[in-house]
Amino acid sequence: MAEAAIDPRCEEQEELHAEDSEGLTTQWREEDEEEAAREQRQRERERQLQDQDKDKEDDGGHSLEQPGQQTLISLKSSELDEDEGFGDWSQKPEPRQQFWGNEGTAEGTEPSQSERPEEKQTEESSHQAKVHLEESNLSYREPDPEDAVGGSGEAEEHLIRHQVRTPSPLALEDTVELSSPPLSPTTKLADRTESLNRSIKKSNSVKKSQPTLPISTIDERLQQYTQATESSGRTPKLSRQPSIELPSMAVASTKTLWETGEVQSQSASKTPSCQDIVAGDMSKKSLWEQKGGSKISSTIKSTPSGKRYKFVATGHGKYEKVLVDEGSAP
């Protein structure tokens, strides 16, 4: 997971490194071409100096002004080298060493040439040497402006290219390395990969140090919803009690009869039955109908067997049942 999160940054850094490496390779090629051109010019000058020395040896005369001539030539060559872009000696140490080596060889040859016998140093040879010196000065002064213009033009182009290209932060990190002699591309790539790995480790450590915030996911919410539905389903639902005022089956049937109109026909057909009437009850009816009867007669009761009884008060709230004779009864 961590590698997938870091991939975009790594790709950007690799692209930047690729661009920087391409720019460095082009710059190195240009510098190599310039160095090759300078070396060719220096070799041509050395050949010319050697040819001049041979010509002078053939002429057979070297004046005392010869050391001064060699110093003038060395000074001119140094000026040309400075015009060609060798102002910063820290970046180009090799040509300087070659230059000092050439001077050492020239100085080493000077005493050998000066130690020649004085007999050969006649006026004619001195005159010829002066003429030859003037010719050589003219021949060296003629290509100087062109070389100076070419060197200055190359230096200006080099500066313009550096100004147009905006330095990237990774290139700024390698300024110390650029001040030193150019290293091989493999070492450059190794250093850059190390710096990339360090930056990746720093970013990973920063991400790990940050605390993860509690985020409610969809699964947690769904679980809460299911729990709520289960708890609501477990609660018993209140059963609806039937209303007390509902009519019974008999009332409902009579209602339907009234609606259909069958109640009147049924009431007309029904007649009151007298089967439940007892014979003893009729005697009570006759007793109640009699007016002005005695209290005793009110207490007499008849039974279905035909015997009559009466209740006689024996005490406070007490009565006794006494059989009544038929003769004594009114």
Swiss-Prot record:
The modification Phosphoserine is found at S77, S78, S168, S179, S180, S184, S243. InterPro entries: Caldesmon_LSP, Lymphspecific. Residues 1-246, 281-302 are annotated as: Disordered. Phosphorylated by casein kinase II, protein kinase C and MAPKAPK2. Phosphorylation by PKC induces translocation from membrane to cytoplasm. Phosphorylation by MAPKAPK2 may regulate neutrophil chemotaxis. The modification N6-acetyllysine is found at K318. The keyword Cell membrane applies. One of its GO terms (biological process) is chemotaxis. The keyword rRNA-binding does not apply. One of its GO terms (cellular component) is plasma membrane. Isoform 1 is expressed in normal mouse B and T-lymphocytes and in transformed B-cells but not (or in smaller amounts) in nine T-lymphoma lines tested. Isoform 2 is expressed in non-lymphoid cell lines (myocytes, stromal cells, fibroblasts). Residues 1-20, 37-62, 113-135 have a biased composition (Basic and acidic residues). Residues 66-77, 206-215, 223-242 have a biased composition (Polar residues). Its main location: membrane. One of its GO terms (molecular function) is actin binding. Keywords: Acetylation, Cell membrane, Membrane, Phosphoprotein. Residues 291-302 have a biased composition (Low complexity). The modification Phosphothreonine is found at T166. It is found in: Cell membrane. It is a peripheral membrane protein. May play a role in mediating neutrophil activation and chemotaxis. PANTHER family: CALDESMON, LYMPHOCYTE-SPECIFIC PROTEIN 1. This is Lymphocyte-specific protein 1. It comes from Mus musculus. The lineage of its organism: Eukaryota, Metazoa, Chordata, Craniata, Vertebrata.
